[in-house]
């Protein structure tokens, strides 16, 4: 069963009039984030460049939750545009504007217009680790193999 939590959200002045994040299907994990750039001034993201796109939103997550900002697969597949620091983490105590750091890996400039869906946000529970220093770690079947050691 899906757990429902309450997240407080506020539009900043430049985000007024834009829809709040919403799930596009009944079983979607991510809510769409929308660009809050001026109507008459879209951002043009040149190939190989990145830009911080405003969403015009601030949120207050419950304690022990985070929001992950992830790419939209359609933008990546069609235009080579993705979230540079994916997943970006929004901590429960952050109260600033949600920004989406997009990069254009494509070969053509990409225009980011007001109201365009630019990323998705997944709300997830947080576990906090307590580290214990030890002299040696227990053995495992994998050992120290990394960077492709379990396959091709």
Swiss-Prot record:
Cofactor annotation: Mg(2+)
Disulfide bonds: none
EC class name: hydrolase
GO molecular function: dUTP diphosphatase activity; magnesium ion binding
This enzyme's EC code(s): 3.6.1.23
Binding site for substrate: 72-74, 85, 89-91
Catalytic reaction annotation: dUTP + H2O = dUMP + diphosphate + H(+)
Pathway annotation from the record: Pyrimidine metabolism; dUMP biosynthesis; dUMP from dCTP (dUTP route): step 2/2
GO BP annotation list: dUMP biosynthetic process; dUTP catabolic process
CDD domains reported in the protein's UniProt record: trimeric_dUTPase
Keyword field: Hydrolase, Magnesium, Metal-binding, Nucleotide metabolism
Family per similarity comment: Belongs to the dUTPase family.
PANTHER family named in the record: DEOXYURIDINE 5'-TRIPHOSPHATE NUCLEOTIDOHYDROLASE (PTHR11241:SF0)
Protein purpose: This enzyme is involved in nucleotide metabolism: it produces dUMP, the immediate precursor of thymidine nucleotides and it decreases the intracellular concentration of dUTP so that uracil cannot be incorporated into DNA.
Protein name: Deoxyuridine 5'-triphosphate nucleotidohydrolase
Protein's organism: Rhodopseudomonas palustris (strain TIE-1)
